[in-house]
């Protein structure tokens, strides 16, 4: 287990659920929680945040992102708990041009499949505590996990407003994702209050990914394109680099 100064960071995990080579599903299990009693305690409180990391994060790398999120939110006087969402994102070959495209495709497959897992955790949490406010925070590829989660939740009208808010940082999803004819209606239905997209034209990773055509123009690079839903807003920021720590430093208020 991953430990931090004698305490185990609360997290939902799907590590080992998907093949890192091709994205194939290896188990029908929805998720695992650590430590169970702490997760149960958090779920039964008035609200909590789920932080979803990006690509190329092993267990320890993911943990670092949760700690960054928790520290930043505490500094902004947010008093509620953060739960980490840990998934198979440590894809081999992303850092090499010769294998980057195939590796990114695998990462995208796994991120999309994790929507099913995260959606189930959210539904289970709301079943135990219907009044809990659940906020999502996603960095880079974590935005895709969130998008896929919203798509699944939107299939049932009973899930209306089940998510309180969403914060995206350097998101890798397409720039037209919040158009009403794309995924906008699903977000408008599922999110109760707001979706905030933190984007940066200076993000070197998203710039390279766009120029190399590894991904469609990401919403975290130059913001949203075209018509957007009313619950969506965006903020242009100047992080030092693509890392979550740099984006988190641009967050001046929460929620």
Write out the residue ranges for each language-model feature:
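Lipolytic serine-hydrolase domain surface
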Residues: 1-44, 55-68, 73-132, 151-165, ...
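Generic beta-sheet signal
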Residues: 47-49, 134
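Receiver (REC) domain switch-region micro-motif
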Residues: 49-50, 166
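The conserved beta1-alpha1 loop
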Residues: 50-54, 139
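Gly/Ala-rich beta-loop-alpha elbow adjacent to hydrolase catalytic centers
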Residues: 118, 137-142, 146
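Residue in the alpha/beta-hydrolase core beta-strand immediately N-terminal to the catalytic nucleophile
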Residues: 135, 139-140, 165-167
């Amino acid at each position: 287990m991953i430990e931090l100064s004698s305490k185990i960071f609360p997290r939902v995990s799907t590590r080992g659920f998907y093949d890192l080579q091709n994205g194939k599903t290896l188990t029908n299990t929805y998720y695992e929680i650590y430590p169970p009693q702490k997760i149960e305690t958090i779920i039964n409180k008035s609200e909590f945040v789920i932080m979803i990391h990006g690509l190329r994060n092993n267990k320890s790398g993911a943990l670092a992102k949760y700690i960054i999120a928790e520290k930043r939110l505490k500094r902004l006087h947010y008093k509620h708990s953060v739960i980490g969402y840990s998934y198979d994102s440590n894809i081999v070959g992303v850092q090499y041009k010769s294998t980057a495209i195939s590796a990114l495709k695998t990462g995208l497959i796994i991120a999309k499949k994790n929507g099913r897992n995260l959606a189930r955790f959210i539904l289970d949490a709301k079943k135990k505590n219907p009044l809990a406010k659940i906020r999502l925070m996603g960095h880079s590829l974590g935005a895709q996990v969130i998008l896929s989660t919203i798509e699944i939740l939107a299939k049932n009208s009973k899930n209306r407003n089940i998510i309180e808010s969403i914060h995206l940082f350097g998101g890798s999803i397409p720039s037209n994702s919040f158009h009403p004819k794309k995924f906008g209606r699903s977000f408008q239905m599922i999110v109760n209050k707001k979706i905030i997209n933190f984007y940066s034209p200076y993000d070197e990773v998203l710039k390279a990914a766009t120029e190399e055509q590894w991904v469609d123009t990401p919403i975290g690079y130059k913001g949203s394109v075209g018509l957007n839903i009313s619950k969506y807003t965006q903020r242009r920021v100047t992080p030092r680099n693509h890392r979550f720590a740099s984006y988190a430093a641009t967050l001046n208020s929460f929620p």
